[in-house]
Amino acid sequence: MAEHKPDIMYGTTIITVRKGGKVVIAGDGQVSFGQTIMKGNARKVRRLGKSGTVIAGFAGATADAFTLLERLETKLEQYPDQLMRACVELAKDWRTDRYLRRLEAMMLVADKKITLALTGLGDVLEPEDGIMAIGSGGNFALSAAWALVDMNLDAETIARKAMDIAAKICVYTNDHFTIETLDAELSSLEKAI
């Protein structure tokens, strides 16, 4: 288990669901500082790029996450319509740059083709089933989404219900959600069905 540093802002829940030709990223609005709620309506999910064709959500230290989002936007300008390449290049920088190496954040990013998680360890991970969650309530949201994915629900409904469950369990997650949706290609599992 990671060491809890009281001077760093922790906790949030971010989930992504790709289903039925849609991809959704949802996040809560709570910003915590140690054991204190500092803000309840933060916007941790946003559109990136000039055309808004990439959506991203972040968990971890807020200032660090904004730094990484800015860097990702720069990479997306260098590699337009190549989200995987932009994320891999960002991950390389994140691991090798002395300043970036200390940033404590994770991100979920998606475009119409792919969903990825980026970690401070330099990982760029793609979920095999189109669902992924990060943050202190991530495991609660992920479990809920997996339970709901086979039901006749769309991606946004699954994400919203999963976030509701995480908000009821995780003290670092509230029920003020920001949700962004894109039209998407079918996931590999959906194509196989």
UniProtKB/Swiss-Prot annotation:
EC number of the protein: 3.4.25.2
PROSITE patterns noted in UniProt: PROTEASOME_BETA_2 (PS51476)
Annotated SUPFAM superfamilies: N-terminal nucleophile aminohydrolases (Ntn hydrolases)
GO cellular component, one term: HslUV protease complex
Residues given in the record as Na(+) binding sites: 167, 170, 173
Description of how activity is regulated: Allosterically activated by HslU binding.
Protein's GO biological process: proteolysis involved in protein catabolic process
Chief location of this protein within or outside the cell: cytoplasm
Pfam families the record matches: Proteasome
Protein location: Cytoplasm
Active-site residues per Swiss-Prot or TrEMBL entry: 12
Record's catalysed reaction(s): ATP-dependent cleavage of peptide bonds with broad specificity
Keyword NAD applies: no
Keywords per UniProt: Allosteric enzyme, Cytoplasm, Hydrolase, Metal-binding, Protease, Sodium, Threonine protease
MF terms in GO: metal ion binding; threonine-type endopeptidase activity
Family the entry assigns: Belongs to the peptidase T1B family. HslV subfamily.
Subunit-level organization: A double ring-shaped homohexamer of HslV is capped on each side by a ring-shaped HslU homohexamer. The assembly of the HslU/HslV complex is dependent on binding of ATP.
Physiological role: Protease subunit of a proteasome-like degradation complex believed to be a general protein degrading machinery.
Protein name: ATP-dependent protease subunit HslV
Species for this entry: Bartonella quintana (strain Toulouse) (Rochalimaea quintana)
